[in-house]
Swiss-Prot record:
It comes from Aster yellows witches'-broom phytoplasma (strain AYWB). The gene is tig. Consists of 3 domains; the N-terminus binds the ribosome, the middle domain has PPIase activity, while the C-terminus has intrinsic chaperone activity on its own. GO terms for cellular component: cytoplasm. Involved in protein export. Acts as a chaperone by maintaining the newly synthesized protein in an open conformation. Functions as a peptidyl-prolyl cis-trans isomerase. This is Trigger factor.
Length: 431
């Protein structure tokens, strides 16, 4: 093994691999898939490697063998603990011809060295926070919002006219150039007036109508209308209003509160107290996040570090993949998301890049705080956190451990402890 230090950011290791070692890994790679191999004339799982290679080629085996060799060498270097690396190493200077000819071959691994962080000040930071208070009007607004959800729609009397926030039930038929157009007709259509659900100007012209009334509504399709052939076209909608419904909000009483079936709440007074507590908890959470943001901003400002672009790119790719997973759960693609928000590729890339840089700055700085303060996480604390997660997600501890390796959990707890230390040592000024 040969070592070559490029600069303070990169270290390269070069290896010689014998044909014998390669053959061992090729055999191992084939043994892993042998039981699934099927070729006519041979029993499943009993196909000789030579026959497999003649039918399917050698590339898959060589790829798996090389991956095993790289992983072995990678672990050897990590165990030496000569330096701290970030991300996965890159394979360099691989002699593929010799590899595929089953000869002795060479390759290298290029590591990104963990950047050095210089912390100028991290204890005694000055942070500001608001006086936490929940006003009566905030409680009232929250309860009114809850009552809104319990509201029912009731029909207005014949003489009443259509007003803002009413729901209209009506028929309509649209005409462009005196001809009906596709999608321009509906029966007993329900529309909340003021919702902006219909074409601009339509709802405004319906205001004041009475049940049973007919009216022609004249509007122009927007220039960016999704049906291009209708864009900028003048349209007449012939409308017949059948019914006007208005929202009736229930009166706040103990009986209504009981019907809501809220935990530990059965009276108006209890609802008010519970709502006040919930709002206060929300403000505390928001305050905690704001303090965390202030601390991180000051730590970044008070630190010196240079993050290699390769690591930022790796983090950016990771963020993008995770974001795409989240979108997939909502049956969306990244392209659809960008179209929906009107964001171009360049802006999206820039946002991912900035977030990647922030994540790395935070991680490296907090890790340095933990190092300088000699913080450690005990086995007991790790096990307790596994139990907490198990109780929270209602799944067995073993399942949590399978999805969250101990090393990752330990690092997460260490980061939390280091950040808490900085926050607890900060000077808090209340506005």
């Amino acid at each position: 093994m040969k070592i070559k230090k490029i600069n303070n950011q990169k270290v390269q290791y070069f290896f010689k691999v014998s044909s014998k070692e390669l053959e061992t890994q090729l055999s191992s790679a084939y043994e892993k898939i042998k039981s699934k191999v099927e070729i006519k004339g041979f029993r499943k799982g009993h196909v000789p490697r030579k026959i497999f290679e003649n039918h399917f080629g050698k590339n898959n085996l060589y790829s798996d063998a090389l991956e095993n060799i790289v992983q072995t060498k990678y672990q050897e270097i990590l165990q030496k603990k000569d330096f701290e690396s970030m991300g996965m190493p890159q394979v360099i200077d691989l002699n593929e011809k010799k590899l595929k000819d089953n000869q002795n071959f060479t390759f290298g691994l290029e590591f990104i060295v963990k950047p050095k962080v210089i912390l100028k000040k991290y204890l005694g930071l000055e942070i500001t926070k608001d006086e936490l208070e929940v006003k009566d009007c905030e409680v009232e607004e929250k309860i009114n919002s809850l009552l809104e959800k319990q509201a029912t729609l009731e029909s207005k009397t014949q003489n009443n006219s259509l007003e803002l926030t009413d729901t209209a039930v009506f028929d309509f038929e649209g005409f462009v150039d005196e001809k009906p157009f596709e999608g321009g007709t509906a029966k007993n259509f329900s529309l909340k007036i003021g919702s902006g659900q219909f074409l601009p100007g339509f709802e405004d012209q319906m205001l004041g109508m009475k049940q049973g009334q007919n009216k022609d509504i004249n509007i122009t399709f927007p220039s960016d209308y999704h049906q291009k052939k209708l864009a900028n076209k003048k349209v007449i909608f012939k409308v017949t209003l059948h019914q006007i419904k208005t929202k009736k909000i229930p009166q706040l009483t103990d009986n209504l509160v009981k019907l809501l079936k809220l935990a530990n709440v059965s009276t108006v007074e209890e609802l008010k107290n519970n709502t006040k507590k919930t709002l206060l908890d929300q403000k505390k959470h928001k305050e905690k996040e704001n303090i965390k943001k202030q601390v991180i901003e000051q730590l970044v400002k008070n630190s010196e570090l240079q993050i290699p672009q390769e690591i930022i790119s790796q983090e950016k790719t990771h963020l993008q993949k995770e974001f795409e997973k989240q979108l997939k759960q909502q049956n969306l693609t990244l392209e659809q998301y960008k179209q929906y928000l009107g964001i171009g590729d360049e802006k999206m890339e820039k946002e991912f890049n900035q977030q990647a840089q922030k994540n790395l700055q935070y991680r490296l700085i907090i890790e340095q705080v933990a190092f300088q303060e000699k913080l450690t996480i005990s086995k007991e604390k790790i096990e307790q956190q596994y139990k907490n997660l198990s109780n929270h997600y209602k799944v067995p501890v073993n399942q949590i451990k399978q999805n969250l390796p101990e090393k990752n959990l330990q690092h997460s707890l260490l980061m939390d402890e280091a950040l808490d230390l900085v926050i607890n040592k900060a000077v808090v000024v209340t506005k």
